Amino acid sequence: VTGNTAIDVLKTEQVVGKMSKGDVPMVIVGEFEANKQQPQVQVLTEKAIYEATLKLIESSQKNDQIHLAMFYLSERQIVKALISAHERGVKLQVLLDPNKDAFGREKNGIPNRQVASELNEAGVQVRWCNTQGEQCHSKMILKSNIQQSEMILGSANFTARNLKNYNLETNIRVVGNSSADVFKDAQSYFNTAWSNLDAK
């Protein structure tokens, strides 16, 4: 990571360092010119991740598609927004971890099984990652149409704990032309997992 994005990441780490009574020195750098032809990147933390994600979903239109790959999905406003997007005609595909295992421990499917049932009843396409003791640990949402794409990905699960300032999280938001490699790569990753193209 370079340029203004690197400075933004450093600033978030300085806040954490200060909170922990540590010190992360500031690096003096010159001004960076952003190349507006390239996708633009924004660093998001905690509640800003929630706000940007909700805006991404709520601003989606009939010609958009949203692909969501998530380890934990339970934040109520996001679930409601996904259902509303589907009702507006947005093509929506949700890929979830079955929450049967987490870091070597057996689990009971909470929260994803309940949310998947709710989404499925509303007509949203939902699939499970084929996990065999490991986790489908992706945390990515991608909105795209022929011209423009927007993606948010990083450390945050879509739960109240992760999105309402109860846990330290860092994501990035990437916005740009849909033909950019970053969006093609993200779409390819999602398609591979969605259709099990690597037979895993």
What are the residue ranges of the model-derived segments?
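Short, small/polar-rich loop/turn modules that mediate ligand/substrate recognition or access, typified
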Residues: V1-K55, L96-S117, N191-K200
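Conserved helix-loop functional segments at active or binding sites
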Residues: K55-K62
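PLD/PLD-like phosphodiesterase catalytic module centered on the HKD motif
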Residues: T2-A6, K62-Q65, E75-K200
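Residue-level signal for well-ordered alpha-helical segments
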Residues: G30, A34, S59, S149-M151
